[in-house]
């Protein structure tokens, strides 16, 4: 007859084996077959699940060098993320993803222009990504600069990209100032939503993929004080 200690030890060993298998499966790279099998909605859910792991302190620990070797001959990311250059919002970390999982385009204030849109057309139509996430964040310095109309070299022209969002935020009332947190956040929210709209307005390629249900484009907001990512809609 097994002793209680033996039984507990055996159970723990079995659990460790099961957990190891799960972690190993989660570290598997995205192959063309895995990418093809996932739905656009499933791709978004993977990002939501990853953020939940990040918040719970249960990010998956993988052998990244092994993933470097495994992806050397090709890539099949399941999603593309348009994010800010802010050092506090690394998309692969906040969504608990690894090498070869996502495309990441980053620019101050997470806006898009033809260069970024063209990159997203590549990521989706040619490389097969099933979801695009426009990821903003709280306390965004670029958004604050747009709200105040800051002047500094080439930054001055870049900040004009946020003018439509600033105008949208004015409709909510409040003082237009970077010191007004509510106005800044209203601008950041409007910016990600307007950017989602711009992607399909500007790109026939993306518009057709969405119409064919091969792609979803969503807006999200990362709270830099908690790590939580809120998805809109």
Where are each of the predicted segments found?
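Boundary at the C-terminal end of the N-terminal hydrophobic targeting segment
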Residues: 21-23
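Short active-site oxyanion
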Residues: 78-80, 129-132
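Short beta-strand segments
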Residues: 82-84, 106, 133-137, 218-222
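Divalent-metal-activated hydrolytic enzyme cores
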Residues: 8-9, 25-74, 100, 109-130, ...
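Gly/Ser/Thr-rich loops at beta-strand to alpha-helix junctions
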Residues: 87-88, 137-142
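Active-site cofactor/substrate anionic-group-binding motifs, chiefly glycine-
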Residues: 85-110, 115
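N-terminal secretory signal peptides and thylakoid transit peptides that target proteins
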Residues: 1-14
């Amino acid at each position: 007859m097994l002793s209680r200690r033996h039984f507990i030890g055996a159970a723990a060993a079995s659990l460790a084996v099961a957990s190891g298998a799960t972690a190993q499966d989660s570290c598997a790279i995205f192959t063309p077959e895995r990418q093809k099998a996932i739905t656009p909605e499933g791709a978004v859910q993977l990002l939501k699940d990853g953020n939940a792991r990040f918040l719970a302190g249960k990010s998956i620990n993988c052998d990244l060098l092994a993933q470097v070797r495994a992806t050397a001959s090709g890539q099949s990311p399941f999603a593309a993320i348009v994010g800010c250059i802010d050092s506090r919002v690394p998309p692969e970390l906040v969504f608990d993803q690894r090498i070869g999982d996502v495309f990441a385009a980053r620019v101050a204030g997470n806006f898009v222009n033809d260069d970024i849109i063209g990159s997203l057309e590549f990521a989706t139509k040619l490389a097969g990504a099933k979801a695009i996430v426009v990821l903003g964040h709280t306390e965004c310095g670029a958004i604050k600069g747009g709200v105040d109309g800051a002047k500094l070299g080439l930054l001055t022209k870049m900040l004009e990209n946020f003018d439509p969002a600033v105008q949208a935020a004015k409709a909510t009332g409040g003082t237009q100032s970077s010191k007004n947190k509510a106005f800044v956040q209203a601008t950041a929210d409007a910016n990600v939503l307007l950017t989602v709209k711009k992607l399909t307005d500007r790109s026939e390629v993306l518009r057709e993929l969405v119409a064919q249900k091969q792609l979803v484009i969503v807006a999200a907001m990362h709270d830099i004080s908690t790590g939580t990512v809120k998805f809109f809609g």
